[in-house]
Swiss-Prot record:
Keyword field contains Transport: yes
Role this protein plays: Transports viral genome to neighboring plant cells directly through plasmosdesmata, without any budding. The movement protein allows efficient cell to cell propagation, by bypassing the host cell wall barrier (Potential). Likely acts as a suppressor of RNA-mediated gene silencing, also known as post-transcriptional gene silencing (PTGS), a mechanism of plant viral defense that performs sequence-specific inhibition of viral mRNAs expression.
Keywords: Host-virus interaction, Inhibition of host innate immune response by virus, Suppressor of RNA silencing, Transport, Viral immunoevasion, Viral movement protein
Name listed for the protein in its UniProt record: Movement protein P1
One GO term (biological process): symbiont-mediated suppression of host innate immune response
Lineage: Viruses, Riboviria, Orthornavirae, Pisuviricota, Pisoniviricetes
Keyword Transport annotated: yes
Length: 185
């Protein structure tokens, strides 16, 4: 299964036949024609976040002043290649600094491994950083080794996020609730 980043308007979201995540989340992105805010219902503390196989497409950043002053990568139109989050091979990720400093989150699309239902989910920058084993704030662009391949998850350290991902990968919330209820009964 391959997940891909999505940048969607509210109308585009409404047209998707997917199970939206059950938590509150303000996904901000910028286009040359203006800015749009998409909100999902629920609470951000929802413990169930699926792991991403491969991040494809563009990383969409909220414009902000460059740390070097004036205009910088964080201010360029998000369609610019400088914002690209590309997988050149399964062994190498190339992430722009905006992935870690300017992006509110990725929206990813997948399907449940138990029921096959499609859904959307997201990762905020802290979760992306944790997934990639980057815990130092203020990182700029650099190649990053993947923390998983298409068969196994290779997480660099033990954390609450890692436990969540290992337990609930590829599972929609309805199935998680059913499984949790079955295990507790």
């Amino acid at each position: 299964m391959i997940y891909e980043t999505l940048v969607l308007s509210k109308t585009e979201l409404e047209q998707l036949n997917v199970d939206l995540p059950r938590y509150s989340y303000r996904f901000r992105y910028s286009r040359s024609i203006g800015d749009t805010v998409v909100e999902f219902p629920g609470t951000l503390s929802d413990p169930c976040i699926p792991v991403v196989d491969v991040l494809l497409g563009a990383c969409w950043a909220w414009p902000q002043p460059s740390r070097h002053g004036g205009l910088g990568l964080d201010d360029i139109d998000p369609f610019d290649a400088s914002f690209s989050c590309c997988v050149t091979s399964p062994e190498r990720y190339c992430l722009s600094r905006s992935v870690l400093s300017g992006v509110d989150a990725f929206v990813v699309r997948g399907s449940c491994k138990l029921c096959g239902l499609g859904f959307l989910d997201n990762f905020n920058p802290f979760e992306i950083r944790a997934l990639l084993g980057q815990t130092t704030p203020g990182l700029w662009w650099q190649p990053v080794k993947p923390v998983y391949d298409d068969r196994n998850i290779h997480l660099p350290y033990d954390s609450e996020l890692n436990a969540r991902i290992q337990r609930f990968q590829y599972t929609c919330r309805e199935c998680i609730v059913r499984v949790a209820f079955h295990m507790s009964s």
